[in-house]
């Protein structure tokens, strides 16, 4: 699953990095919600092999509402439980070539919600990008990694995570992302 909003120049890179995974292609389905987009985001996503739903809602603009909409459409068209799990990405994300395989290894070990290492590709672009980079480094090194070593639960944030379909059996109820 991917949320997009005016990011047509970014999604093509994410779509390409998903399509280049070392994981079997027939086990990957890319869903995108083009959220309140008036540009070519939806057509770009479709050209990169995504099943794209378009959502227009000026009252409910958060990523959580976009994911809720997307999972409702998946439920209607495919059945949410017809997929073992769902990855959540933002359109400007890039994946290492073995990302899905490594996340699947953790999933196959019985984990139901898995977060991943996130890094910043534009650290020196501006102070906002640098601040986010420091936040991600701190979060991963001091929170997620330590909790993983101790086999404790952690939290998920924003992007780069996987959850079992049973988590959304009754829909996505988390709109404050």
Would you name each region that the model predicts?
Residues 1-7, 21, 106:
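A conserved hydrophobic helix/loop-capping motif in glycosyltransferases and polysaccharide synthases
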Residues 54-80, 98-177:
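Long helical/loop segments within the catalytic core of UDP-sugar-dependent glycosyltransferases
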Residues 34-42, 57-59, 94:
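A conserved acidic beta->alpha catalytic loop
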Residues 12, 39-46, 98:
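Acidic helix N-cap motif at the loop->helix transition within catalytic regions
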């Amino acid at each position: 699953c991917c949320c997009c909003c005016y990011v047509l120049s970014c999604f093509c890179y994410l779509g390409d990095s998903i399509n280049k995974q070392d994981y079997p292609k027939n086990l990957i389905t890319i869903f995108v919600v083009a959220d309140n987009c008036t540009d070519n985001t939806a057509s770009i996503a479709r050209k990169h092999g995504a099943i794209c739903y378009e959502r227009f809602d000026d009252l409910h603009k958060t990523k959580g509402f976009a994911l809720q909409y997307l999972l409702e459409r998946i439920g209607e068209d495919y059945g949410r439980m017809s997929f073992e799990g769902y990855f959540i990405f933002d359109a400007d994300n890039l994946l290492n070539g073995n990302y899905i395989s490594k996340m699947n290894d953790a999933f196959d070990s019985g984990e139901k919600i898995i977060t991943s290492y996130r890094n910043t590709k534009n650290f020196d672009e501006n102070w906002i990008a640098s601040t986010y980079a420091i936040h991600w480094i701190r979060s991963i090194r001091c929170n997620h990694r330590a909790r993983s070593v101790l086999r404790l639960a952690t939290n998920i944030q924003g992007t780069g995570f996987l959850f079992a379909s049973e988590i959304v059996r009754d829909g996505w109820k988390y709109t404050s992302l």
